């Protein structure tokens, strides 16, 4: 239930902030894609208690590694991208939105 509520909050927040994105449900994850060219911006994998948000970029300087962001390029994972944040609460959602914005800005430029 917690992850489901977080998922809906995250989905709504992303779609409200970035109107040029569309949501697509895949078998193992959900994704947000550019309406213009179909490129992935981020994907979300839900577990029982948290969300795994994958930023759809391989650019090391775009999403800085931190306690909130880990490099998963050498770890098996669902989703598209090399950087992941675990979303466990509303504060994590707020922290992730600017990072999604960086990927979005990079993809549309």
Question: What residues fall within each predicted segment?
Answer:
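Solvent-exposed, charged helical/coil patches
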Residues: 1-10
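Surface segments flanking catalytic/ligand-binding clefts of nucleic-acid enzymes
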Residues: 9-24
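Intrinsically disordered, low-complexity segments enriched in polar/charged small residues
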Residues: 16, 27-31, 89
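Short, conserved beta-strand/beta-arch hydrophobic-aromatic motifs that form part
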Residues: 24-83
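Well-ordered alpha/beta subsegment
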Residues: 74-109
């Amino acid at each position: 239930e917690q992850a489901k509520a977080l998922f809906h909050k995250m989905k709504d927040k992303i779609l409200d902030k970035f109107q040029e994105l569309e949501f697509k449900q895949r078998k193992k994850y959900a994704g947000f894609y550019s309406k213009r060219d179909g490129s992935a911006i981020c994907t979300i994998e839900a577990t029982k208690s948290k969300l795994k948000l994958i930023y759809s970029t391989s650019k090391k300087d775009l999403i800085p590694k931190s306690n909130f962001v880990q490099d998963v390029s050498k770890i098996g994972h669902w989703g598209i991208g090399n950087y992941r944040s675990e979303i466990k609460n509303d504060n994590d959602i707020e922290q992730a939105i600017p990072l999604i914005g960086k990927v979005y800005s990079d993809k549309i430029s």
